């Protein structure tokens, strides 16, 4: 492992958490050899300076605070950040996030008059928005009326 590769990775981590996949991609862009990348990642993980588990927990909290649901966050972690499904599931089980409360906050912010929107067209719009932001129907269906998901598709 070269000190240049290690310094580059430490510099990245000094600004924010990165997943192993993200560091690997950034180091490949800088044309470090695979051996340098492997050695650097091993040393970072040995010193506990890089941890996919810690990254996942922080990312989960940050995205939930920004108004995204479980499905969206899981997809981002797996596809964009290269986190293993087991790590994502473990972090979700350990977190104490009230997804229904987040769904209600998102609903109230995006659709302040959602209680008055009782026609089918407006309910469909709300359903599409909430589902596209990664919320399960159970997290928000009670807030927008007695309809079921099947009625809106």
From Swiss-Prot:
Species whose genome carries this gene: Mannheimia succiniciproducens (strain KCTC 0769BP / MBEL55E)
GO cellular component: cytoplasm
The protein, known as: Regulatory protein RecX
Signal peptide: none
NCBIfam families: PRK00117.3-3
Function statement: Modulates RecA activity.
Gene Ontology biological process: regulation of DNA repair
Sequence similarity: Belongs to the RecX family.
HAMAP family: RecX
Protein location: Cytoplasm
One family name in Pfam for this protein: RecX_HTH2
Main location: cytoplasm
InterPro entries named in the record: RecX_HTH_1st, RecX_HTH_2nd, RecX_HTH_3rd, Regulatory_RecX, WH-like_DNA-bd_sf
Entry keyword set: Cytoplasm
Top-rank lineage group of the source organism: Bacteria
């Amino acid at each position: 492992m070269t000190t240049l590769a290690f310094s580059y990775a430490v510099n990245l981590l000094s600004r924010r958490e990165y997943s192993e996949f993200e560091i690997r991609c950034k180091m490949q862009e800088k044309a470090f050899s695979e051996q340098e990348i492997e050695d650097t990642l091993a040393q970072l993980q040995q010193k506990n300076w890089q941890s996919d588990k810690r990254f996942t927990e922080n990312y989960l909290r940050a995205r939930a605070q920004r108004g995204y649901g479980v499905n969206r966050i899981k997809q981002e972690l797996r596809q964009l950040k290269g986190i293993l499904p087991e790590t994502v599931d473990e972090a979700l089980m350990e977190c104490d996030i009230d997804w229904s409360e987040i769904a209600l906050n998102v609903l109230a912010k995006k659709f302040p008059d959602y209680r008055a929107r009782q026609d089918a067209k407006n309910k469909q719009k709300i359903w599409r928005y909430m589902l596209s932001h990664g919320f399960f129907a159970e997290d928000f269906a009670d807030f927008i009326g007695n309809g079921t998901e099947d009625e809106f598709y």
